[in-house]
Amino acid sequence: MSPSVEETTSVTESIMFAIVSFKHMGPFEGYSMSADRAASDLLIGMFGSVSLVNLLTIIGCLWVLRVTRPPVSVMIFTWNLVLSQFFSILATMLSKGIMLRGALNLSLCRLVLFVDDVGLYSTALFFLFLILDRLSAISYGRDLWHHETRENAGVALYAVAFAWVLSIVAAVPTAATGSLDYRWLGCQIPIQYAAVDLTIKMWFLLGAPMIAVLANVVELAYSDRRDHVWSYVGRVCTFYVTCLMLFVPYYCFRVLRGVLQPASAAGTGFGIMDYVELATRTLLTMRLGILPLFIIAFFSREPTKDLDDSFDYLVERCQQSCHGHFVRRLVQALKRAMYSVELAVCYFSTSVRDVAEAVKKSSSRCYADATSAAVVVTTTTSEKATLVEHAEGMASEMCPGTTIDVSAESSSVLCTDGENTVASDATVTAL
C-alpha cells in the first residue's frame, strides 16, 4: 500500500528540518542536543521501570484483597484499571524514543499515540465509574459483598464496555494527527493541534468526571449516611487535585508554546522552551506511578484496614502450613513490604494523623505477635532446654532488631527496644 500525499509531505518536512538543523549547528550544540535527548530517555525509562514494578505491586495487593470477598463490580473496574495502566506504560515507553530510535515509522508512531490515549481515557472513565459505584454503595449501606445483586455486576460490565468504546472513539483524532518528533526522537501531537488536544483531554480527564462526581456528592450531602461517605469523598478530591497537577501543566504549555513559538519559527538548537517542555512532560509521566496507588485507595471504604486484615490472614495460613526458617523469614519480609504499600496508600488517601497511626501500628506489630504464644509445660530437663532454644528463635523472628533474653530459670521471653518490654505467655515450668 503506497503512502498518502499527507504522510509523504509530513515525513519529507521532518527530514528536511533535521538536515537543516544539523547543518547549521556546531559540534558543541550537537553534543548538547544528544545529551538532552539522553537525559529525556533516561527519565522516561526510569519512570517506566518504576511504574511497572509499582503496577506489579498493586496486582499483588489486589490478589491479597480477594480474601475480603470484594463485590464483583469492584473487581471488574479494578482489573480493567490495571489493564489500561499497562497500555499507558507500554505506549509511553514506545512513543518517547526508548524503542523507536532505530525504527522511526509514521504509521507505528500514530498507532502508539493512539494506544496511549486509549489507555489514558479509559483510565479516567474506569476511575469515575468505580468512584460512583462505591459512593452509591456506601451511602445506601450496601458496600459489602453480600449486598451486591446481579444487576450491579451487569451494570459494571456494560460500563466497562462503554468506556473502552468511548476511549477508542476519542483517541481517533490522535491517530489521525500524530507525527514524528525529530527534536526528541519520538512521537508527538503537532504543535498546531495542541489546543484541540488540550480541549479533548481536559474534558475527558477532569471536566466531565468532576461534574459527575460533584453532582453525586451534592446529592449525598442530604443523605442520612453522609458521615460514612466523607472520608471516601476526601480521597476522591485528592485524586482529582493530583490529576490536575499532573495533566494541566504539559497540555497548557503546549498551547502556550504554539502561540509564542510556532513550529515554523522554532530554532535548530534547544532553548528554554524545550527544557520547560521536558519538565512538564516528566511531570506528566509521573502519572504512570502515582495513579495506580488510587486503585487500592478506592477499593473500599477502609482499604488499608482491609489490606492489613487480608495479609494477616494469609500470613497466619502460611505459618500454619509452611515449615522452615527461610520460609518464616520470607513471610516476615513480605509483611513489611505490605506495610510500605499501606503507608503509600495512606499518604494519598487519608490525613497525616492516619499515616502516623499506620506507622505506629506497623512498629508495634511484633509485640502483638510476641504475646500470642501458649503456655507450655515440660517434664524433663532436655525438653526444657529444647523449648528455650525454640523460644529464642521464635522471639527473634517476631521482634527483629531487638534484644532477646530467654531465661529458663525465670521462664519468660523478653523483647526490648529501649522503651517497651514485652514478655510472652510462653513459660517453661518444670514439674
Swiss-Prot record:
GO CC annotation terms, alphabetical: membrane
Annotated TM spans: 42-62, 74-94, 111-131, 153-173, 202-222, 236-256, 279-299
InterPro entries linked to this entry: GPCR_Rhodpsn_7TM (IPR017452)
Topological category with respect to the lipid bilayer: Multi-pass membrane protein
Location in the cell: Membrane
Glycosylation sites: N105
Record flagged with keyword Membrane: yes
Record has Cell inner membrane as a keyword: no
The entry's keywords: Glycoprotein, Membrane, Transmembrane, Transmembrane helix
Name this polypeptide is given: Uncharacterized protein UL78
Organism of this sequence: Human cytomegalovirus (strain AD169)
Gene field: UL78
